[in-house]
Amino acid sequence: MYYGFDIGGTKIALGVFDSTRRLQWEKRVPTPHTSYSAFLDAVCELVEEADQRFGVKGSVGIGIPGMPETEDGTLYAANVPAASGKPLRADLSARLDRDVRLDNDANCFALSEAWDDEFTQYPLVMGLILGTGVGGGLVLNGKPITGQSYITGEFGHMRLPVDALTLMGFDFPLRRCGCGQMGCIENYLSGRGFAWLYQHYYHQSLQAPEIIALWEQGDEQAHAHVERYLDLLAVCLGNILTIVDPDLLVIGGGLSNFTAITTQLAERLPRHLLPVARAPRIERARHGDAGGRRGAAFLHLTD
């Protein structure tokens, strides 16, 4: 059995998957905020409960935001303060007496989608998350590409290309990102960026779901906004796809529920790619909130 954990600032979620990659059991508990000992206990107790339930010693994979293992072997995860700065992988491996694997939660999302029954035919899969931020991951032949710093797929921290400024106007404001850089595309293409763009052009403060509801009602202003957003997304993705050249692009995160993104993006992409380039197949993520757990569990399928 494959045990996959999706760990965030508020919850530790476990999914147990069988050899056919089907979910058999799941459970979640609150994430301890201050005590590392309590954090380890929470994870280990879930593993032990699963072992007893299924009568096997399952493999353990964990998806967590941040850098799963820094140069000194410790975790860096600002949203999980109880475990950040601690040798999480080594401690759990020792306590559970098995190989525990960690990866970035965005990489786990991409891995989950790459191992979908329909998508395993594609050698290079790119996962793109359009949610609170913009991130993603790359999977090549069923294995995540992580890089030495686990920042492969941090697409949101690429800067706006010159074509974006041609589209939006050269007086378009370059916003300072939380990472400290100016003009990161996350500030414009995330759910918050989607809302910020609307406020910037129309001087109305609405959340993304409210804007999308107006678009669905045929509101002309919302329609113009969505067209502008999709054009900007296509410009930025054109740069990324020219580097990555994936066979399949899977879009997740809250904005992926807005079907216009996946249905209309394909029309816009070709003009931003090299003439010889083939645009990837574009799909919405298939596994929703379960994606992080699935991908974490499947870290043990990548040998």
UniProtKB/Swiss-Prot annotation:
InterPro entries tied to this protein: ATPase_NBD, N-acetyl-D-glucosamine_kinase, ROK, ROK_cs
Keyword Nucleotide-binding: yes
A Pfam family reported for this protein in Swiss-Prot or TrEMBL: ROK
UniProt record, GO biological process: N-acetylglucosamine metabolic process; peptidoglycan turnover
Amino acids binding ATP: 4-11, 133-140
Keyword terms: ATP-binding, Carbohydrate metabolism, Kinase, Metal-binding, Nucleotide-binding, Transferase, Zinc
Pathway given in the UniProt record: Cell wall biogenesis; peptidoglycan recycling
CDD domains xrefs: ASKHA_NBD_ROK_NAGK
GO molecular function terms listed in the Swiss-Prot or TrEMBL record: ATP binding; N-acetylglucosamine kinase activity; zinc ion binding
Leading EC class: transferase
EC number(s) on file: 2.7.1.59
Reaction catalysed by this enzyme: N-acetyl-D-glucosamine + ATP = N-acetyl-D-glucosamine 6-phosphate + ADP + H(+)
Binding of Zn(2+), residues: 157, 177, 179, 184
Family assignment from sequence similarity: Belongs to the ROK (NagC/XylR) family. NagK subfamily.
HAMAP family: GlcNAc_kinase (MF_01271)
The protein's role, per its UniProt record: Catalyzes the phosphorylation of N-acetyl-D-glucosamine (GlcNAc) derived from cell-wall degradation, yielding GlcNAc-6-P.
Official protein name in the record: N-acetyl-D-glucosamine kinase
Species of provenance: Salmonella dublin (strain CT_02021853)
